[in-house]
């Protein structure tokens, strides 16, 4: 897979720019603030239909304008595909493949996979559990359309369940039973996929961490879930009184987490800044490797200012790993 060309119009700080890329490595060099990261985010948009950095498309529109347009030319197995993404304020985002609009954005996810490594990834360790769930989702969704559909259906039912809890009424419990039955099979799909991913990710991650850090500390990833083989509908029923008190669904697959440990301690508190940085780079390289294995071809790997706080030896090792 190869991104041959990209065009940006009114995207972030760019009024208009077109870039041609060569196969292999492409490097952007320039002062801070000139827009290097924005080009990477445009590639992320064309791959996953959304920004890496924020959930609002409006934030990607150039100041003073009311729309942006992205175009890209991807090559895979000797076939060229032209991608088109446009967003205008107060309107729906449009995404096209070879001139034909997708009925659903999710239909595009996984066609041209991508892995982004950015300083913002520090939130994987220091942030809340939603950051780590997003990490899981962005991996599995790029090779498993069944998971992506299950995740979307689960979230839709969850939003409706939470609305019923907030609004109350005499039929609340019967309505909750309906949504519980809708959520349970989707939760099972999500749980199994995340569990399998974590097990497959562990050896890749440990190997990359050892090579990058050059140290012998033990690192681990552990998947923590409310499901764990128990009856999901029964769990939801048993938590209803707490749900009513808190005014939202307090238990479920949407509360899952990844636990990152170093020498048996939580990496959030026990790891130094350098160790956390090595942890994140190893995670993302493991993600890159796993998606490559699942899809049979390598995704685009976007590296955004990742060498800060690394010594010369670690920088050389990361470059070697990426090059291999």
Predicted regions and their residues:
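Conserved NTPase motor "head" modules and their coupling/switch loops across ABC/AAA+ ATPases, GTPases
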Residues: 1-31, 171-185, 189-302, 309-324
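Helix-to-loop junction immediately C-terminal to a conserved catalytic motif
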Residues: 44
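Short amphipathic alpha-helical interaction patches enriched in hydrophobic/aromatic residues
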Residues: 47, 143-144, 165, 187-194
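Nucleotide-state sensing region of NTPase/ATPase domains
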Residues: 47-131, 140-143, 147, 202-207, ...
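Intracellular alpha-helical coupling/juxtamembrane segments of multi-pass membrane proteins
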Residues: 60-63, 154, 194
């Amino acid at each position: 897979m190869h991104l041959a060309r990209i065009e940006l119009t009114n995207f972030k700080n760019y009024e208009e720019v077109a870039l041609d890329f060569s196969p292999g490595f492409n490097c952007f060099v320039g002062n801070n603030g000139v827009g290097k990261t924005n080009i990477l985010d445009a590639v992320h948009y064309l791959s996953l239909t959304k920004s890496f950095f924020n959930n609002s498309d409006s934030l990607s529109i150039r100041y003073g304008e009311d729309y942006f347009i992205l175009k890209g030319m991807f090559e895979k197995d000797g076939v060229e595909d032209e991608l088109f993404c446009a967003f205008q304020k107060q309107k729906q985002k449009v995404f096209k493949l070879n001139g034909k609009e997708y009925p659903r954005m999710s239909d595009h996810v996984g066609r041209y996979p991508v892995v982004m490594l950015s300083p913002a990834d520090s939130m994987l360790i220091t942030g809340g559990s939603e950051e780590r769930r997003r990490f899981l989702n962005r991996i599995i969704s790029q090779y498993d359309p069944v998971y992506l559909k299950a995740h979307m259906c689960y979230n839709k039912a969850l939003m409706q369940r939470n609305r019923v809890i907030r609004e109350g009424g005499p039929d609340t419990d019967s309505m909750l039973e309906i949504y519980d039955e809708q959520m349970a099979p989707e939760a099972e799909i999500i749980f199994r996929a995340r569990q399998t991913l974590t097990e497959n990710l562990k050896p890749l991650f440990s190997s990359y961490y050892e090579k990058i850090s050059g140290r012998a500390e033990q690192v681990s990833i552990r998947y923590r879930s409310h499901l764990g083989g128990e009856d999901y509908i029964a769990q939801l029923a048993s938590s209803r009184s707490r749900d009513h008190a808190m005014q939202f669904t307090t238990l479920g697959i949407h509360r899952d987490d990844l636990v990152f440990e170093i020498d048996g301690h939580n990496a959030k508190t026990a790891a130094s800044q350098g160790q956390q940085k090595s942890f994140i780079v190893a995670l993302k390289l493991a993600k890159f490797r796993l998606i490559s294995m699942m899809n049979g071809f390598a995704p685009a790997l976007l590296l955004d200012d990742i060498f800060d706080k690394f010594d010369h030896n670690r920088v050389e090792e990361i470059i070697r790993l990426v090059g291999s």
